[in-house]
Amino acid sequence: MALEMRLPKARKPLSESLGRDSKKHLVVPGDTITTDTGFMRGHGTYMGEEKLIASVAGSVERVNKLICVKALKTRYNGEVGDIVVGRITEVQQKRWKVETNSRLDSVLLLSSMNLPGGELRRRSAEDELAMRGFLQEGDLISAEVQAVFSDGAVSLHTRSLKYGKLGQGVLVQVSPSLVKRQKTHFHDLPCGASVILGNNGFIWIYPTPEHKDEDAGGFIANLEPVALSDREVISRLRNCVVLLVTQRMMLFDTSILYCYEASLAHQIKDILKPEVMEEIMLETRQRLLDQEG
């Protein structure tokens, strides 16, 4: 049995070395954003006594004359085209209910998915009876937002071979505000693992497949044993994601890769120790600043 004793370490607050990220205009509910009446009121704001006031805690964003406040911690608000990772919670008539970290359950229609083998035909009664064979409660899927209803509920689709059931890997749940929007959210990292950065804050880390089975239609999960080296890479990436989230840094492929490379000098179990987290975070942040400028 290994016993580890650690003493408190005097260290400067991390906020003293935040660099450019500290210049964000942060507000709390009740703060006055501006007294200029020429601006339009956006999400997270309201007008009071001819002043624009914040109604949520977050960062102020301005687009031309529109001012809104992006909450630091919130549920996922779906937008058409978003990539999400979700968990099947219920099988219903011609549809699945999916948990996507939003206020309401999302919906995946039977007509919005590829049939096994990629067949292009109308869904029949036999397909409806076999729905639980395609996806059942507890299964994880990757999908794209097809539509957003007036009440905020989200409709999903998996009409591409890159979407579908997820096999073996690790799921990390973070705040959706920390996931950076990019052209692609599927990344094969050079360290030997892949990540899906869901816009809804669900991060899926899995071993990079050698080849994709296109005949499966995205609904056959690979359950072969994962090699120890791959499991170690996945565990290290998972701890790196948790580290970045703890330090409120944006999640995208470059930040995760830089954090992974900075953590190679430490054991996986030591990454989340406070003094190690500070060392890795400072190196990661410096590399990102060097890349920007």
Curated annotation (Swiss-Prot):
One of its GO terms (molecular function) is RNA binding. GO terms for biological process: positive regulation of cell growth; RNA catabolic process; RNA processing; rRNA processing. It is found in: Cytoplasm; Nucleus, Nucleolus; Nucleus. Residues 1-20 are annotated as: Disordered. CDD domains: KH-I_Rrp4_eukar, S1_Rrp4. Residues 79-159 form the S1 motif domain. The modification Phosphoserine is found at residue 124. It comes from the Eukaryota. InterPro entries: Exosome_cplx_N_dom (IPR025721), Exosome_RNA_bind1/RRP40/RRP4 (IPR026699), KH_dom_type_1 (IPR004088), KH_dom_type_1_sf (IPR036612), NA-bd_OB-fold (IPR012340), RRP4_S1 (IPR048565). The keyword Nucleus applies. Disulfide bonds: none annotated. One of its GO terms (cellular component) is nuclear exosome (RNase complex). Keywords: Cytoplasm, Exosome, Nucleus, Phosphoprotein, RNA-binding, rRNA processing. Non-catalytic component of the RNA exosome complex which has 3'->5' exoribonuclease activity and participates in a multitude of cellular RNA processing and degradation events. In the nucleus, the RNA exosome complex is involved in proper maturation of stable RNA species such as rRNA, snRNA and snoRNA, in the elimination of RNA processing by-products and non-coding 'pervasive' transcripts, such as antisense RNA species and promoter-upstream transcripts (PROMPTs), and of mRNAs with processing defects, thereby limiting or excluding their export to the cytoplasm. Belongs to the RRP4 family. PANTHER family: EXOSOME COMPLEX COMPONENT RRP4, PNAS-3 RELATED. Component of the RNA exosome core complex (Exo-9), composed of EXOSC1, EXOSC2, EXOSC3, EXOSC4, EXOSC5, EXOSC6, EXOSC7, EXOSC8 and EXOSC9; within the complex interacts with EXOSC4 and EXOSC7. The catalytically inactive RNA exosome core complex (Exo-9) associates with the catalytic subunit EXOSC10/RRP6. Exo-9 may associate with DIS3 to form the nucleolar exosome complex, or DIS3L to form the cytoplasmic exosome complex. Exo-9 is formed by a hexameric base ring consisting of the heterodimers EXOSC4-EXOSC9, EXOSC5-EXOSC8 and EXOSC6-EXOSC7, and a cap ring consisting of EXOSC1, EXOSC2 and EXOSC3. This is Exosome complex component RRP4.
